[in-house]
Amino acid sequence: MLIISYIALCLLFIVYLYTLSVRIEGKIINVMVPYLIITVPTLYVFEGIFVYLSEVQNYTVEYLFFYTCYITYIASFVISYLYTQRKPIYNKSNTKNKPRYVFTSLLFTFLAFIIYLPVLMEFREYILSPRRIYELTRTGYGIYFYPSLMFSLVASICAFFTYKKSKLFCISIVLFNCILIFLHGNKGPIFSIFIAFILYLSYIENKKIKFMFLVKSFAVIAVIVTAFFAYTFTDGNPIENMANYSDYTRNAVLVASSNFDFMYGKLLMESEVYSRIPRAIWPDKPEDFGALYLAKVFFPDAFYRNQGAPAFGYGELYADFGLFTPVWLVISGVFKGVLAKYFSNKTQETKSAHYFIMFLFCIGISVIPVSMGWLFPEHLMIAFMVYIASSFVFSEHIRFVLLRNNK
């Protein structure tokens, strides 16, 4: 089948981009790893299985278009990352005054727990069924749900920087936050913590991680995800359930194959603006903005159930820009690749969590678990908060002392 062959060709090109990244950066765990762990299984493996099991020949052109879009974006991103800025020679004296992250990780852990506590109190009968909490808090609880997840992710990342000082403390903080994240009914951030940690080892500690470690990581994640689907969806084959669950591309194909009128950037604008306004501030905020409008049009039953509407991947961009979608992807890919390289250089130069958070965001690991909008300004604010918090130490006299920055 032509679609399967093209997906396989795209996978070969991704392998080439990864080997290129390894050769230039000298790291097995590099900028491509989040894409390999998160995106490749979803967009290529599971969707490939779905295409193989289903009759989609009538949508061949649409499938080829969107897989071309996928390759266009990742190629633009990786090439701009690798070739737009030289890697500086770092001066060891630049990392002399290291920030302190024990207090920072404790602070953000405390905030994550306190913010989510009202939800746990209200839905305490569902604590052993976190997915039910997730379903019941889709509307009106974002002011508790998302900040709590965000602070848990930030706390875990800050805890990484205490790993060399105290492994027990680091593991305890990360484990507590993973349990708290699990109680949100959202499994995605836990994988983000794992990916962030191996990137920390590679870019902060400069560990020479072997390729087999990456292979074993893939295997462990595959087992966990398969077990999750086997437990959650008791009917049918877990592999088929995963293939049916990874519906980004086929939903985008649904948009492209319909007579949907182009929105000329309206959906993108709504995703960038409306998603930033809490419903507590704007009670009358529309339910059908951005990609949710597509869900309302194409999956009205799921939309009105309000328990998580289907995602559309690049279908949202296609609804706005049509055949000009690849042009947008090239521009955004190059821009984000340049940003990622800048923050990569700063991360390796300063060994600091605030730059590391920005680097993670630029390569696809967001600490704000919101699917809409490009949350770069918000991540800058979070990075600044981490910078301020890490400038304090908890002294032996039980007081906070602002560290002087000797320049």
From Swiss-Prot:
GO molecular function annotation: transferase activity
Reactions catalysed: n lipid-linked O-antigen repeat units = a lipid-linked O antigen + (n-1) polyisoprenyl diphosphate
EC class of the enzyme, as a word: transferase
Swiss-Prot/TrEMBL keywords: Cell inner membrane, Cell membrane, Lipopolysaccharide biosynthesis, Membrane, Transferase, Transmembrane, Transmembrane helix
UniProt key word Cell wall biogenesis/degradation: no
EC number of this enzyme: 2.4.99.27
Topology of the protein relative to the lipid bilayer: Multi-pass membrane protein
Keyword Membrane: yes
Metabolic or biological pathway: Bacterial outer membrane biogenesis; LPS O-antigen biosynthesis
Protein name: O-antigen polymerase
Name of the gene encoding the protein in the UniProt record: rfc
